[in-house]
């Protein structure tokens, strides 16, 4: 039972870590574009969305190798627990 709770806890932790970078990048881009729009009094609504989309896409592209390694390691751990009869 404790192994199942451990795996559930680790899965939630991985979800938190995986979502941290894209959300953080979108937040930083949104704040900086919002500040730039405030200073220049530009009222374009689609500008932050497009730039955030590009930023998050680039971050996911750059981090996809690391995401794959961590997720594969987690899956191996789960398969080992299933094989051992938990």
UniProtKB/Swiss-Prot annotation:
Keywords: Cell membrane, Membrane, Plasmid, Transmembrane, Transmembrane helix, Virulence. The chain crosses the membrane at residues 11-31, 54-74. Required for surface presentation of invasion plasmid antigens. Could play a role in preserving the translocation competence of the Ipa antigens. Required for invasion and for secretion of the three Ipa proteins. It is found in: Cell membrane. Its main location: membrane. One of its GO terms (cellular component) is plasma membrane. It is a multi-pass membrane protein. It comes from the Bacteria. InterPro entries: Bac_export_3 (IPR002191), T3SS_HrpO (IPR006306). Belongs to the FliQ/MopD/SpaQ family. Pfam families: Bac_export_3 (PF01313). GO terms for biological process: protein secretion. This is Surface presentation of antigens protein SpaQ.
